[in-house]
């Protein structure tokens, strides 16, 4: 889904969602994609391999062919898409599942934010606190420009407090959420 706005889906991702017989993902992603989901498609709140694999097998037993699994953010940057892709590829490799697996990325959140802010990002340090730890203060001190992917509002508040405590309250922040 990329940044989560249906206007910003790639055509490929939009088609995959529209043609899917089953669409899986977190509740908010299913809601965001709802305008593109076929009326007769089944929606399932699932995005972890442990939940998806048994469900995919049950769908396949019923003859379901097209299944879309939704993720937000960038598919290649600390995304849950990686774990699901690896799990599905392993099932295919072991001969347990016959499937073609395609990752259809949305528009990159980094690219989108940088464009909206009028900033380049080829010289930026890219850091994620989305489900992981990072020493943002050290990065801000060391790097000329830092692009930071966060989990949400609570991360922003915590990072702001850390920067202020470190005497970095004068740094420029551009926030997209």
What kind of feature is each model-predicted range?
Residues 1-4, 21-24, 104-107, 125-128, ...:
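A short linear-motif detector with a strong N-terminal bias
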Residues 1-102, 134:
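Class I S-adenosyl-L-methionine
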Residues 9-10, 76-81, 107-112, 156-158:
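Short glycine/serine/threonine-rich phosphate/pyrophosphate-binding segments
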Residues 100, 109-177:
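Beta-strand/loop-alpha-helix module characteristic of Rossmann-like adenine-cofactor folds
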């Amino acid at each position: 889904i990329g940044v989560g706005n249906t206007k910003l889906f790639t055509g490929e991702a939009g088609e995959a969602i529209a043609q899917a017989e089953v669409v899986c993902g977190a509740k908010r992603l299913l809601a965001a994609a709802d305008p593109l989901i076929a009326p007769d498609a089944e929606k399932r709140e699932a995005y972890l391999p442990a939940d998806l694999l048994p469900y995919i097998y049950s769908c396949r037993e019923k003859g379901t062919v097209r299944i879309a699994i939704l993720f937000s953010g960038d598919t290649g940057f600390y995304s849950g898409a990686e774990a699901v892709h690896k799990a599905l590829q392993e099932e295919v490799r072991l001969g347990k599942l016959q499937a073609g697996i395609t990752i259809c990325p949305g528009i990159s959140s980094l690219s989108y934010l940088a464009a909206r802010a009028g900033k380049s990002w080829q010289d930026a340090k890219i850091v994620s606190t989305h489900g992981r730890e990072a020493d943002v203060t050290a990065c801000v001190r060391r790097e000329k420009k830092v692009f930071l992917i966060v989990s949400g509002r609570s991360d922003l508040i915590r990072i702001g407090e850390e920067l202020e405590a470190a005497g970095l309250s004068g740094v420029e922040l551009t926030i997209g959420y």
